[in-house]
Amino acid sequence: MKRSAFLACAVATLALAACNKKEQQGSAPAVNDTVKITQANPPPGGNWSDVVNETAAGYLMGNPSAKVKLVEIGALTCPHCREFDEKGVPVLIEKYVKSGQVSWEFRPYLLHGLDLPANLIARCNGTKSFFPLARALYKDQADWIAKISAVPEAQLEQVQNLPINQQFVELAKLAGLQDWAAARGVSLEKSNQCLRDENEVNQLVQLSSDVSTQYPDFPGTPSFIINGAMLKETASWEKLQPQLDEALK
């Protein structure tokens, strides 16, 4: 099996069940945007970027009642998403999120077989750790993708023959993600548990599948939504920032 085919397989195998389910039920329901609020008051010093809540579809940083609600649909293996994280996110947080005027929600999308183990690790240490881990994964993206790219085809084929919940542990090991996570406070024992969590895996696959159902014009990653409206031709901070400014008027 070619490398690209295998690395898509981890997503495709699980997505098949979600697709079949949607065919039986008709269209999938829209994502519930309810935020599971654990803190809705300004933190000490008024820095809203310290407030993170889990949502039905991802994680939200900032004021849940912000005037402008920004949603990013991103993939942790996506180089353009990494570029947005590098160039746009620092300004987004400092200028817009901290004040409480804008909230930023990250919703995962699965482009590549490695997106599943990467997301499972980013979610592994709880709500407060999600953004630091996800941003660190973007920073080191080239390294862990290079490691999996160097794995011989025969070894990848052996991984493919493992049960699904073991495949993600092995993919994470081959990409160096478990050692990477351990250096950032996610123990080997904990990452093993998270990587074998079939409920989390199924949830990530379903959330990714639901994106194209809820947003038929979804153009790929990264994509951005402001107050419920998908933005067109907006895949960079340079394109996004003027639209944030306009929404704040």
Give the role of each language-model region.
Residues 110-220, 225-229, 233-238, 242-249:
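Cysteine-centric redox/oxidoreductase cores and disulfide-bonded domains
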Residues 2-9, 14-116, 205-208, 212-213:
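Extracytoplasmic thiol/disulfide redox context detector
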